[in-house]
Amino acid sequence: MQRESMEYDVVIVGAGPAGLATAIKLKQLAAEKDQEVSVCILEKGSEVGAHILSGAVMDPVAMDELIPDWKDKESPLTTPVSRDEMYFFTTEKKAIKWPNLFMPKPMHNKGNYIVSLGNVCRWLGEQAEALEVEIFPGFAASEVLFHDDGSIKGVATGDMGRAEDGSEKESFESGIELHAKYTVFSEGCRGHLGKQLIEKFELDKDSDPQHYAIGLKELWDIPEELHEQGLVVHGAGWPLSESASTGGCFLYHAENNQVSVGLIVDLNYSNPHLSPYDEFQRFKHHPKIAKYLAGGKRVSYGARAIVKGGLNSLPKMSVPGGLLIGCNAGTLNFAKIKGCLLYTSPSPRDQRGSRMPSSA
C-alpha cells in the first residue's frame, strides 16, 4: 500500500528533553547562519510531557546554554534547592544522616532547581514551536525507513483502525512516512526503534553491558506545616538492603505544598520474590519519610525504566542518516546521577573520543 509522505530536513522521534533541545538548537544554529531548516518532532503522548516521569532536580547549566534568557520567559524552574539531606537507612526505624561536609561535590544541589520534568518539556515545546518547529503529538513512530544503501531515510507512523486479526476496519487510516536528511531518535529508555538500530548497526559491540533500574514515583499534597520548599532528600539502604538489592530513594519538596517521593530499584536483583512496588510502600513508612507524608494525599503516581550504565555502557550514537540521543542512547552524568541536564551540555566527545558525537 502506498503511504503518504512528508519531507523534512530533520525528523526527531520523541518530545522529551533531549529531542526538544535538539530541535531548538538546530533552529538557533540555522538562524545564526541565516538558513532555513525544517524540523519535525513526533511524540507518542497525547501532548508534550504526557509520557515524562521524573523527580527531578535539575542543574540549570544546560538551560543557560540553550535559552540564556529562560528566567524572563516564565520557565518552570521556580523552586531553587534550599538544602540537601542524605541518609543511609539501616532499618525500618533507623537511619544515619550523612554529614554534608563529607558528601561528594557532585551530589551537592546548591544552585539547582526542583522541577516537574513534564512541565519543563511542555515549556520547551512552546519555545520550539515559537521557532517554527512542527510537533505532532499523538503519533508514534512504528518503523525505521532505509535507503537502498542502508542509510536511514526516516520513519513511518503506525496504521490506525486495524482489527485484532490485522484486517482493515472502516475507520482504517494508513501510517504516514516522514523522510529526512537526518533522523534523531530520542524515544527514552529502551525505545523500540533505538534498540533495533543498536542491534542492526552493532552500536554496542565495544561497550559494556547496559544497566537498568525501575523508578517508582508519587506526587503528594502535604500539610503546609510539614512542607519545606526546596528541601532535597536522598538516601539508600533499607528496605532494599534486606534482600541484598541495590538502588536509592528521594524526596523533593516542590512548590505549592507538594513533594515528590520515589524509590529506584536496580534490575539486577537476584531475589525472584522481590516486588519493587511493595518495597516502595514499605519505604514510605520509614519515620524519616512518613513524617512528611502524614496527613497528606497522593495525587499522582507512575513508574518508568531508567538507564544507568554510564559512560562505559554507551553505544556509538551515530549511524548513516541518524543519531541516538538522551536515554535512547543512555547518556547519564553518573557522578550527579542525572540525565536531563545533559541535553545541551558541552560535547561529550571530550569524555569518550569518537564514540559520542557532539551533542545538539
Residue spans for each PLM region:
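N-terminal Rossmann-like FAD-binding beta1-loop-alpha1 element of flavoenzymes
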Residues: 10-35
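N-terminal FAD cofactor-binding segment of flavoenzymes
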Residues: 45-91
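Conserved small/polar residues in nucleotide/adenosyl-binding loops
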Residues: 343-350
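Short beta-strand to alpha-helix junction loop
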Residues: 107-126, 271-274
